[in-house]
Amino acid sequence: MENYFVNSEKKHLIQSSISSYESIHKTIGAVPTVIEQSGRGERAFDIYSRLLRERIIFLGSGINDQVSDSLVAQLLFLEAEDPEKDIQIYINSPGGSVTAGMAIYDTMQQISPDVVTICFGVAASMGAFLLSGGAKGKRLALPNSRIMIHQPLGGAQGQAVEIEIQAKEILFLKKTLNSLLAEHTGQPLEKINEDTERDYFLSPSEAVEYGLIDKVIKK
């Protein structure tokens, strides 16, 4: 049954991943194109699709459902291609939807390959959470990147009962995220709770000491 899934879904997953990538990055700006020569002539790839073939995924925007669906599809496809070889995720994200981010996080934890997380630019909020969720020993950051953690943000309007429901959900998400951060960093939950009350910025070296990452990339 597993082989059938891989064979029947592989083509759909890669087409879905590439289409989502193209859609997302077209909204950001012009995407460089790579021309490859083959026995059948030239073939053009956008740079992100080409890097996907090298098991490199980019999270270079805010996190929403579309971004989440694209990353999950790519992770599943790369696992189907090779369940043993590492997958790299480069993160430059201000964060975004907690539920969309948790979909990416859960997939990272469930697939067989180790997921290498690399911060370039900034990994803030849910971006920092995903950075910390990479495989132990394989969570990295470039020297001048910035990392920020804080509690979930949210707003509610409507009747008092509806506001109360939303407030309970935000508190639940806060408890869940902080517990997982404590697990990934090795910090006491009380310290995580205190530090995330406000925006808490760290340099890469500080993030290593905190346990959010394992190493700063240097030449």
UniProtKB/Swiss-Prot annotation:
Top-rank taxon, per record: Bacteria
Cellular compartment(s): Cytoplasm
Enzyme Commission number: 3.4.21.92
Enzyme class, first EC level, given as a word: hydrolase
Keywords: Cytoplasm, Hydrolase, Protease, Serine protease
Record GO terms (molecular function): ATP-dependent peptidase activity; ATPase binding; serine-type endopeptidase activity
Gene3D superfamilies membership: 2-enoyl-CoA Hydratase, Chain A, domain 1
InterPro entries reported for this sequence: ClpP, ClpP/crotonase-like_dom_sf, ClpP/TepA, ClpP_His_AS, ClpP_Ser_AS
Family annotation (CDD domains): S14_ClpP_2
GO cellular component: cytoplasm; endopeptidase Clp complex
HAMAP family for the chain: ClpP (MF_00444)
Function (record text): Cleaves peptides in various proteins in a process that requires ATP hydrolysis. Has a chymotrypsin-like activity. Plays a major role in the degradation of misfolded proteins.
Subunit composition and interactions: Fourteen ClpP subunits assemble into 2 heptameric rings which stack back to back to give a disk-like structure with a central cavity, resembling the structure of eukaryotic proteasomes.
Protein name: ATP-dependent Clp protease proteolytic subunit 4
Native species: Prochlorococcus marinus (strain MIT 9312)
The gene coding this protein: clpP4
